[in-house]
Amino acid sequence: MLYIEQSEMMLVPLITVTVVAGTILVCYILYICRKKIRTVYNDNKIIMTKLKKIKSPNSSKSSKSTDSESDWEDHCSAMEQNNDVDNISRNEILNDDSFAGSLIWDNESNIMAPSTEHIYDSVAGSTLLINNDRNEQTIYQNTTVVINDTETVEILNEDTKQIPSYSSNPFVNYNKTSICSKSNPFIAELNNKFSDNNPFRRAHSDDYLNKQQDHEYDDIESSVVSLV
């Protein structure tokens, strides 16, 4: 019994010594490794901060993506509504008896209004419209010019209405009422006084000359210039 008690008394200091020695050893080891531990801790801290920074933009991107998706859906729905409104308005315009809806095609492949006015005339106001059936030419500028087929065209060969112009042309007699100049052989002799000195006049027979003497004041030309 005494031996057991003595052995127990010896174990208590040994246990205490080992515990104290162990703690001292651990503290020494930690003291030696403090730099490494500190570097590891700092590295871990940096890694955690980086991870937090990475997570925050991802979360913002996810929120932005959800917002953009919702915005896109709203945009699509708005576009569909606008298309529906446009279709309804177009149908109403086509069904309405408006100017554009009542346009027709004429025989000349031109767009004509119901009032037989050309579509370009209604827009520009100055385009020329020719109506072949009525033989008239209308300009839509508050001016109407009528051309008739039966309109008499005045003869330019009349003596009293000849306008002297381009006097440098030797082949035309602009003053037919006066006596033909003998110095200009290119002018046709309109009177009966034929000159024998003019080699460019056409030779006439005696019958023709007699007829010309009978009709001295006729307006028909008596000769035509011809070059030999």
From Swiss-Prot:
Short sequence motif NPF-motif: positions: 169-171, 184-186, 198-200
Phosphotyrosine: modified positions: Y120, Y140
Extracellular-side segments: 1-9
Principal location: host cell
Membrane topology field: Single-pass membrane protein
Family recorded in the similarity comment: Belongs to the orthopoxvirus OPG164 protein family.
Functional summary from the UniProt entry: Involved in the intracellular transport and egress of virions to the host cell surface with help of protein OPG056. Also participates in the formation of actin tails at the plasma membrane to allow efficient actin-based motility and thus cell to cell transmission of viral particles. Recruits host intersectin-1/ITSN1 and activates host CDC42 to drive ARP2/3-mediated actin polymerization.
Name of protein: Protein OPG164
Organism: Monkeypox virus
Chain's gene name: OPG164
